[in-house]
Amino acid sequence: MQYKYTKFMSKIKKIYICNHSHTDIGFTDYQDACFRQHGEFVEQALDLIEKTNDYPKESKYKWTVETTGPFIEYLKNAKSSQIDRFIEWYKKGRIDVAGMQYNFTPLLSMEQMIRSLYPVKILKDDYNIDITAAMQDDVNGVSWVFAELLSMIGIDFFSIAVNPIRGARVKPFPGAFIWQGPSKRNIIAWNGFHYLFGRSQVGFGNKKFTDKLLPRFLNKLENDDSYNYDFLYCESTHPIRVDNGPPDERMSNFVKSWNENNELKMEFLTVSEFGKKLNEDYKDKMQTQRGDWTDHWTDGPGSSSYETGLNRKTHELLLSYEATESILKIFEKSGWNSKKVESIYENMTLYDEHTWGAYTSIDMPESLFSKAIWNKKSWYAYNAAMETHDLLAKSSNKFAELVSDPLYDSTSASADQKVEGNFNLGDHEESVAYPDPNSNELLVINTLPFEREIVIEEPEARWGLAPVGILDTFFERGASWGGFRPHTPVRKISTKLP
């Protein structure tokens, strides 16, 4: 049967299908299970790639790994034979990897954004996988900084499939433009249909639905004078498990059958191939746009404002730890723990990832599944916070010992202080129990990129009063150990912090 709209179409010559799984860390399954599933999807995609290898070129199956986060975890546990199999089909262009670590909210700090691209370097250095494209799905935008960072590491194409539910798409839509970063680095950006478009909106995989749904979109593009492309580009996931879904064997058979019976052909391609096509055939027709692509309705972070605030504070505390350790390193006193820091950044980032709650969280908020998903999501924030406080407390104690050592600086006011201190159980005079801290020198770290006015309160002298660890950070002045502080007044100073 001839596709009934073909004879009327002068513009659209091909339908391109990018098949992938949408990465939700949570929502459909417990977070740990999601990581395992995306590794399984790689194996299933390779099975389907091999199974369709004798199909016509357009219907040979292709798969794009949407995010590097779960993929890196898969590679860590994969056998050498599994890795070799992946590399074989990657080199043949049948399976691809996009460069973003996860689908993100706007919560990431600059350091997180940079670290989120570390997997790109790991994949290139350790596996010879050279990533040239990145994609985001189900969000409304990403930080302007990514236009800069992606281009700096050799990624020249960025695709986004905006979630249209209360989400405003930039223009052109659908369409491409050159996204220029803050320092005028450029990357080609495609602002396309939602990732459910292929399976849900035009019914790919089921001819009955496609015949009914596809014509409306084709006609709209045919009659849109601002649409300057000869193709329809569709992202497509699993028809049932639209999020965290596996490859669907029916897609290759559907494309093969469609092409045998229609003049308007369909073809699988990866996100990198699509970016290359835009670069070669359409770049000279693209307009340049500058500015932040703001994701403006992230309801999730607002629904858990305490944990969101906690995680944002952890961003800054971890930078304070890094600054303190940098000073200690100069004097060969550093206890820098790169593995622990890497783990903390990963947990902070997994809280800032775009998935909030379970799919049951509205209808069944008290269910085991809803509670388990939220427990893990919030755990990312709490774990990162506690581990950061522990590192910072230990690092700060080392720094305090360093600057209070007369061998380090005998002119320091703190040089006369004793690290041991006095533990008061009510048997000391007030002047002994609450000595003057004599803190004429304070280290205050500004983790923000601009000058600000602050009020500093002199810390209480309690050397050795608490274990060297997290308790140091949360020990309050009014704690019952020794009672209130009646003897020495608390001094405060207002200053500008550069």
Positions of the model-derived regions?
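Carbohydrate-active enzymes and regulators
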Residues: 1-498
